[in-house]
């Protein structure tokens, strides 16, 4: 999904690419904090505020990638890499992630959720200037504003406990406004996209290979 950022990412993008709010080529929306809803019985709304003089953002990943690749800061070669030995570089960020359960470079992590339903709805009249994280009977849902007068919804749940149909029903009942296709962000046509995922971590995130190159493991497949 990857739309939200932390405060330091905004500073880095400004320093490296000169990204600004007027041109906004990455289709960013302001993120002034994080609102946790219904996670506590005593306090239904817990707001994690950022310092008043700082700001994070939510971006469209597709446009953020395009902006960085077109920045002119480095040469870009497009291709499918299956063997890192074919890459001529001193430092390699391997963002392919773990695609093989027998991959000895990664180990699984326990996570109570392992699937997400993605959809889009129209934006509310009043602008949302923070990320919403809403507790649900099956897990939680992220609610993120976009620049296209839409809002992204991600209903996160455990597919081994909650069936897909039950999750879809609860999603539509709790967020009836999330009824449009996520296709503008991803190559999907259906209104609600189900995306299962696994949680894992690299046993050795940074290592030196036999050729003396620094390999940094990161990312998901």
For every predicted segment, state its role.
Residues 1, 48-54, 149-154:
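Glycine-/proline-rich flexible loop or hinge segments
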Residues 36-72:
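Mobile amphipathic helical/loop "lid" adjacent to a hydrophobic cofactor/ligand pocket
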Residues 62, 66-176:
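Predominantly flavin-linked oxidoreductase catalytic cores and closely associated redox partners
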